Design a protein with these regions (language model features):
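Positively charged n-region of N-terminal signal peptides that target proteins for export
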Residues: 1-5
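Short, glycine-rich nucleotide/cofactor-binding loops
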Residues: 41-55, 85, 89
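Acidic helix-start/capping segments at beta-turn-to-alpha-helix junctions
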Residues: 72-86, 114
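Histidine-anchored nucleotide/phosphate-binding helix
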Residues: 51-67
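Bacterial N-terminal signal peptides
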Residues: 7-17
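Acidic/histidine-rich, surface-exposed loop or edge segments in extracytoplasmic proteins
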Residues: 30-46, 76-80
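A cross-taxonomic marker for long C-terminal extensions/tails that follow the last structured domain
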Residues: 87-154
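Sec/Tat signal peptide C-region and signal peptidase I cleavage site
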Residues: 18-23
């Protein structure tokens, strides 16, 4: 009986070690080709804050995997997706994540239709500049896909 438990313990330890190595695995150089990607952010109710953190983490992981010089990322924000920039005004962690991704070259694009329909002044959205505004979020998603961007909706 002791031998059985001892063997199971060793097996479990080995399995955990393998899992740990896999979690730290990085792609070899050249594994990923250059990429153009558009992420679709329309919010994640009922817990928008958790959804936004997951979205930004996915984007960061994407950049880390491919390399910032090998990926061009746009994030089209419309509907409840604009809540991310409202929350970031009072959430330093969320603001930092947005800023860090911008520093990596990520461009956040804001839907003017949503601004108009919800009576939101873009000046009140964290880090948004006039150049970030697009006429229509969904039309921008289609335009970017026509330009060869791969669509991702986490």
């Amino acid at each position: 009986m002791r031998t059985l438990f001892g063997s199971l313990f060793v097996f479990a330890a080995l399995l955990l070690g393998i899992t740990s190595v896999q979690a730290q695995m990085t792609a070899p150089p050249g594994y990923y080709k250059d990429q153009k990607v558009v992420y679709h952010n329309d919010g994640g109710a009922p817990d928008n804050a958790a959804y936004f953190r997951k979205l930004l983490t996915n984007i960061k992981n994407h950049i880390d995997a491919v390399g910032k010089d090998h990926v061009e990322i746009r994030v089209v924000d419309h509907g409840d997706g604009l809540i991310m920039f409202q929350l970031a005004n009072n959430d330093p962690d969320l603001a930092h994540r947005i800023d860090a991704l911008k520093a990596e070259g990520v461009k956040f694009l804001i839907c003017s239709n949503t601004l108009r329909e919800r009576h939101i002044d873009w000046h009140t959205l964290y880090g948004v500049k006039e150049d970030d505004l697009v006429p229509s979020g969904v039309a921008e998603l289609a335009r970017l896909q026509q330009m060869g961007y791969v669509y991702i909706h986490p």
